[in-house]
Structures are given as structure tokens and as C-alpha cells.
Amino acid sequence: MKVLVVYKKSAWELFSRSEDPNVAHFMEQSGRDAQSVEQSHHVQKESMETITSTLIESGAQVSILYRSELSEEVTKNIDLAVTIGGDGTFLETSHFIHEEVPIIGVNSDPSRSVGFLSACNGSEFPDFFSGLDKQPRFNLSRARAKINDKVTGPPILNDILFSNPNPAATTRYRMGEKSFRNSGCLFATAAGSTAWIFQEGCAPLPLENNETLQCYHRGNRNANTSTSNSFSLQSLTRKGRIYIDGEHLSYPLSIGQTLELTTGPSLTVIGDLERKRKTFLTKYNLNM
């Protein structure tokens, strides 16, 4: 079995190499926040060692990759993908994973990361992997974006935002016969319906095999959530942008251009996501 392991660098690794004097000053302090960053680094390193040794001992052919080095080429011909980090690492990896390849998310430090898409943490991975064939699997629907009828970006697992790149500026766009002036338009998949759009006040969607998309107009008083299998939007913003699954991946959507969202290829995720989702929603006195 060919396994691709994708990891994130800890904040301590990134901060300790920064040339920013403010970051350097922060790292030199002995306060609680700086200590927490270093402690998390050791936890994540231990998770990495546990996971990789478990995979190697199983006889798997293991390739290890930093998440910024991901490409379609390196994800070809693999049998399984394992992400070590949090939801951000999982989302970034999902952009390069074909629908026939299963993926496991491992939360490298549960004290600092929610890891909603993670099946287990580092210390739990050996037991989880030994019973891999018995673990639940979910087919999560992804969305596909087109700008002026041209496929743009990777499959979208969580959400996509259209907005002015300046958060203090007005975003202008048209959907059908109606024009909007607000803080941007946020779309989410079923998997993403308990993420950003949920914190905007929208209700979660059922998780598995759900091709429905949600749409929410940010910054409009008493805005309602609409659902559909597809959405179309025309930008009336001169320098608008779309942001896919967070802040790291974006594309321009200039005035006059059209964004179309439809169902894309699904993603096979290993782990009991329904259990984690129910636990999360009980905090808000909600049930699916």
C-alpha cells in the first residue's frame, strides 16, 4: 500500500525562523503564550513520529510531504492519504486527492486545533490504523467553481467566499435579477456547513452524499440562507476575489465576470465524522 503523509509545520518552527522583529521578540519571551507554542511543537513532533512509525511497521510504502509541496503529480498512484495537523492541513490536501483515494485526518495537537475532519489524534492512530477496515467511511460532496465557464481552482470541500479583498470595503454583485451591496457572499458544502457559515448563524446540512450548497449574504441585516445544487453570481466589484477553503487559495473575480458553483467530485473520508459532528452540535443545543 502506498501512503502519502502530509504534515504541517508547527507555529514554533515557523516563528523561530522568522525575520520579523516582532515575531522574534515574541519567541524570546518566557510568557505563557510563547511557552504554549513550544509545547505544541513537541506534541506535534511526537504525533508525527508515532504515525510514521506505525505506517512503516505495517509494511506500507510511505512518502512524507510538507503541505506547501503538494501537487497533483505527487498524489498520483497513492492508495491512502494521511494528514497530520488540523482542518487546514486536511482541507489543503483534499484539493489534490482524487475521489477514489481515501483520506484520514489526524489531529496533531487537540489542545490547539479543533480537527473536525480528523478521525483521531496522534496517540490514537496505532489502534485506529490497526482496525482500518472496520472504520466508517463517508463520501463527502465537494463543489466545483467556474469563472466565465472555465473551471477555476480545485474541488471545494468546505466553503468559498466572494468578496472585496479589503474587508472594510463594500462588495457588489448580482444574483439573478437582484443586486447586493454587503460584506461578500459565502457558499458552503454540507461538510462546510458546520464551519464558517455555521458561525454566521446558518443551520447545518446533513453530511453524507449531500450535493446541496448553502448561500449566505454577509453583512445584510436579517439575511436568509438559500440552498441549491448550483449558484451563479456576477461580480460588480472591480477587484473582487474568491477564497477557496480559507485564506491560502484565492483567484480574482473582476467586474463583469461570472462565478458558477456546481457539484464536484466527492471525497472519501475515513473516520466517524457523524459522531464528532453530533458532539459539536450539542454545544449549541442542536441535533441533526
Task: Identify the residue ranges that each predicted region occupies.
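Catalytic phosphate-donor-binding core of small-molecule kinases
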Residues: 2-9, 24-26, 32, 36-68, ...
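Internal, charge-rich low-complexity segments
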Residues: 10-24
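Beta-loop-alpha module in the N-terminal Rossmann-like domain of NAD(P)-dependent dehydrogenases
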Residues: 72-73, 86-88
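Structural motif
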Residues: 79-80
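Redox-cofactor binding/interface segments in oxidoreductases and associated redox assembly factors
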Residues: 83-84, 187-188
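Short glycine/serine/threonine-rich phosphate/pyrophosphate-binding segments
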Residues: 89-93, 193-198
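Short, conserved loop/helix-junction motifs that constitute active-site signature segments
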Residues: 96-98, 206-207
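Short, acidic/small-residue loops that bind anionic groups at enzyme active sites
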Residues: 99-117
